[in-house]
């Protein structure tokens, strides 16, 4: 299985508001940057979308180290939220529908294809790749938002 590192970040101008996401995939000496934009979204959705789109770039099952500064994204798997939600019919402990359910379901599907290690990094720190992802995300907002 190929080993790939993925860094992701999401950003929002207003919450909700215009959002951007960015990701960097690293395999050996190769790097690929991807990014995108959505209107009327939230920062949490952008964090999930960044991870989904990065994982969808992989053409075969891989061992993935996925780095994110989003506790929301990382804890979904490290704290077993996703497993609990699935057992509860995608309802929270308060019997409410899980927010961003369709995105969590897609991440769950992708996590069954790839062997993913979810790694929390400190946001806006000295992590070069996280900072680059943040710039990709915010550049998408600047490029696509109405002035």
UniProtKB/Swiss-Prot annotation:
It comes from the Bacteria. It is an enzyme of class 3 (hydrolase). It is found in: Cytoplasm. Disulfide bonds: none annotated. SUPFAM superfamilies: Ribonuclease H-like. Its EC number is 3.1.26.4. Gene3D superfamilies: Ribonuclease H-like superfamily/Ribonuclease H. GO terms for molecular function: magnesium ion binding; nucleic acid binding; RNA-DNA hybrid ribonuclease activity. GO terms for biological process: DNA replication, removal of RNA primer. Mg(2+) 1 binds at residues 9, 47, 69. Mg(2+) 2 binds at residues 9, 134. Keywords: Cytoplasm, Endonuclease, Hydrolase, Magnesium, Metal-binding, Nuclease. Binds 1 Mg(2+) ion per subunit. May bind a second metal ion at a regulatory site, or after substrate binding. Its cofactor is Mg(2+). Residues 1-142 form the RNase H type-1 domain. Endonuclease that specifically degrades the RNA of RNA-DNA hybrids. This is Ribonuclease H.
């Amino acid at each position: 299985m190929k080993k790939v590192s993925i860094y992701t970040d999401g950003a929002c101008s207003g919450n909700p508001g215009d959002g951007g996401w960015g990701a960097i995939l690293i395999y050996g000496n190769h790097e690929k940057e991807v990014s995108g934009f959505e209107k009327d979204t939230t920062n949490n959705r952008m964090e999930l979308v960044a991870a989904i789109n990065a994982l969808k770039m992989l053409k075969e099952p891989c061992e993935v180290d996925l780095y994110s500064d989003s506790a929301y994204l990382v804890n979904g798997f490290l704290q077993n939220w996703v497993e609990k939600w699935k057992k509860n019919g995608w309802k929270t402990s308060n019997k409410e529908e899980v927010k961003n359910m369709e995105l969590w379901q897609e991440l769950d599907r992708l996590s069954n294809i790839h062997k993913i290690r979810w790694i929390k990094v400190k946001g806006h720190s000295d992590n070069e790749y996280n900072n680059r992802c943040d710039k990709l995300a915010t550049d998408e907002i600047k490029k696509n938002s109405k002035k």
